[in-house]
Amino acid sequence: MAQSNWEADKMLDVYIYDYLVKKKLHNTAKSFMTEGKVSPDPVAIDAPGGFLFEWWSVFWDIFIARTNEKHSEAAAAYIEAQQGKAKEQQMQIQQLQMMRQAQMQRRDPNHPSLGGPMNAIGSEGMIGQSNASALAAKMYEERMKQPNPMNSETSQPHLDARMALLKSATNHHGQIVQGNHQGGVSAALQQIQSRTQQPTEIKTEVNLGTSPRQLPVDPSTVYGQGILQSKPGMGSAGLNPGVSGLPLKGWPLTGIEQMRPGLGGPQVQKSFLQNQSQFQLSPQQQQHQMLAQVQAQGNMTNSPMYGGDMDPRRFTGLPRGNLNPKDGQQNANDGSIGSPMQSSSSKHISMPPVQQSSSQQQDHLLSQQSQQNNRKRKGPSSSGPANSTGTGNTVGPSNSQPSTPSTHTPVDGVAIAGNMHHVNSMPKGPMMYGSDGIGGLASSANQLLQDDMDQFGDVGALEDNVESFLSQDDGDGGSLFGTLKRNSSVHTETSKPFSFNEVSCIRKSASKVICCSFSYDGKLLASAGHDKKVFIWNMETLQVESTPEEHAHIITDVRFRPNSTQLATSSFDKTIKIWDASDPGYFLRTISGHAAPVMSIDFHPKKTELLCSCDSNNDIRFWDINASCVRAVKGASTQVRFQPRTGQFLAAASENTVSIFDIENNNKRVNIFKGHSSNVHSVCWSPNGELVASVSEDAVKLWSLSSGDCIHELSNSGNKFHSVVFHPSYPDLLVIGGYQAIELWNTMENKCMTVAGHECVISALAQSPSTGVVASASHDKSVKIWK
């Protein structure tokens, strides 16, 4: 229609008329056009069902998703995608702000602001000229008064003085405050450059080969991969003008070190790469931190490890730059690119607080800041009873011994900020507290010499300090998961409160779901049951494909082949079928030979051609999936599961016992776990393969493979148990499926919590160590994802 007819008050009439026409309601459309005086000009609306229909569909999906997310998974995914885009855009804006601040500092080197924007990701604003920054500025000015000649025949005392200057400038501003210290470090370095008359051109952008869209979307993590921002390097005496120690487009400059003729030792130029996403401190805490550093600096002035007495030979263990024989320029890279913590070549940064009395006051400040951060950061915490996010119900600590049944109270939802020591959330090894707070983790390229480390004593005490610093509570043991530790072999993300929440609900089955299984990379989830076909879910897009109903009866178990998209299904029709998830339209082969319904299957973790199955007649068969049955034994009628990683042992459930078979020793039965008073429904292995959990209606038992004893037991309190699996991130936590509810059992403290799960029996549980999620399948025809 003509442009003049597109007034705001006419738009709705135009859309309604277009909708009626495309719905072929021509008489109604004609009447509406006449009465509403709608323009007869053609409407340029590119929507097959009419713009009104398109608009209403999107509106309704979003509306119903916000009121009841179970009604529209597509809308919920749309909202989640929009939130992700918003976070991504925010990260780009923050990166832009930091780059702009760096440019402003380079344009105005005559007015450095040592108390400048030391803000977290540039969002906290200026913190002002505090007492700490004034003290730091004064000490910096005193050091700048020292002579620093430019000739190449510099004497050894002058070299020592330059190294002291390097260390003081590095450590005065080497705070653990999150963010890139644009004001402090950049201005200080530019002041050095102006006094030595060595303008250094630094590229603002340090590109690590990834686009801004690949930056982390959660800036609140304590140790996320941060945005690396370039800092002007220190122009050491003897370096040619314009030389930068920064990497070129993110790639480290090659080569090792250079020695200027006449110098008593190597000259080291560091590129200051800060991790944006380190410990978060408020502006007031930043001031306390800075003041503590200045005081600690004053106490350590006479230390042989600090200041002008620094032996230049201590730099020999550091990564070296490249010697250019043409102009003698040095390109040094400290190997800290991509490192999760700030690296430093200063030796004193590795001093543990337990050995240095001068940093006791700062440790006190750090402990206070840690407590303040925990109070701000964590959700509902519990030093005694555990709180839930959904209701006011609480669970108190259990006084029962680990070998006795524990009692528990249902709680709707879990978000416990207990004393969760995440074992490897901070790397262990030569990482220690220094007088500047948290020291850097020396990489393999710049580890300190072993003899320098000997004086620091046992590192074990330090690791305790790190864990207590990262803990979310006082560690009094009163919280539900007070001593729960994260699986160090899989998860290295930051310490955060434990939570177990439903993140997705999948409803595609028309009948009961009996089994589910993750692929080894966690990207696919297969579920099956009374539908006699397998539903295969893409965990990234939640798109689903299904196999045809090739089985004649219900499917009892489904398992993925290790490191493959192939999977196997067992059925009441006495057969096993092999499928490929990448092309599920038809099965690859059928394995026959059982004389009774096949109840369970499992692939060997290493010998991926080997498949084990059991039937209701207590027969266990081992198959070569490309050939036939290779051997058979008696001993399982419910479930079979190989020991993870090695596959040396097989756990087999039959009636009320669990048998352990040694696969590498002619399938010899090496142990029988007895103790259940009713039939065992499910078994699972701990991640390290040293424990076996078995579940029956009345109890869950945890068995030691080495001793054969039941070391922990949980009796039900009215909720009949049916399935069990170890939590993928916390190896001491068992996830138990019962009737409608999921039990979370901390085996170390023998405490339990109940989470509302499904509307019927939770028939199976699966977990993915790769993604840290748990899947639950139920007779209510749904599969839920938990994390």
Curated annotation (Swiss-Prot):
Q: Which SMART domains match?
A: LisH, WD40
Task: Specify the inducers.
Answer: Induced by exposures to biotic stress (e.g. nematode and Botrytis cinerea) and abiotic stress (e.g. salt, genotoxic, wounding, drought and oxidative stress). Repressed by exposures to biotic stress (e.g. Agrobacterium tumefaciens) and abiotic stress (e.g. hypoxia, cycloheximide, 2,4-dichlorophenoxyacetic acid, AgNO(3) and aminoethoxyvinylglycine).
Q: What does this protein do?
A: Transcription repressor subunit of the SEU-SLK1 and SEU-SLK2 transcriptional corepressor of abiotic stress (e.g. salt and osmotic stress) response genes, by means of an epigenetic process involving histone modification (e.g. H3K9 and H3K14 acetylation), probably by recruiting HDAC, to facilitate the condensation of chromatin thus preventing transcription at the target genes. Can also act as a transcription activator. Implicated in embryo and floral development.
Polar residues bias locations: 380-409
Q: How does it assemble?
A: Forms corepressor complexes with SLK1 and SLK2; LUH is the transcription repressor subunit and SLK1 and SLK2 the specific DNA-binding adapters. Interacts with SEU. Binds to YAB3, YAB5 and YAB1/FIL; these complexes promote adaxial cell identity in leaves as well as embryonic shoot apical meristem (SAM) initiation and postembryonic SAM maintenance.
Expression sites by tissue: Expressed in roots, stems, leaves, seedlings, apex, flowers, siliques, flower organs and seeds (including seed coat).
Compartment(s) where it occurs, according to its Swiss-Prot or TrEMBL record: Nucleus
Coiled-coil regions listed in the entry: 77-106
Listed name of the protein: Transcriptional corepressor LEUNIG_HOMOLOG
Record flagged with keyword Plastid: no
Q: Give the InterPro entries listed for this entry.
A: G-protein_beta_WD-40_rep, LEUNIG-like, LisH, WD40/YVTN_repeat-like_dom_sf, WD40_repeat_CS, WD40_repeat_dom_sf, WD40_rpt
The beginning of the lineage is: Eukaryota, Viridiplantae, Streptophyta, Embryophyta, Tracheophyta
- Gene source species: Arabidopsis thaliana (Mouse-ear cress)
Please list the residue ranges covered by the WD repeats: 508-547, 550-589, 593-633, 635-671, 675-715, 717-755, 757-787
Q: Which UniProt keywords apply?
A: Activator, Coiled coil, Developmental protein, Differentiation, Flowering, Nucleus, Repeat, Repressor, Transcription, Transcription regulation, WD repeat
Ranges where the record places region Disordered: 299-413
UniProt-annotated stretches for the region Required for SEU-binding: 1-88
Q: Which gene encodes it?
A: LUH
| Compositionally biased region (Low complexity) | 336-346, 355-372
> What positions does the domain LisH occupy?
8-40
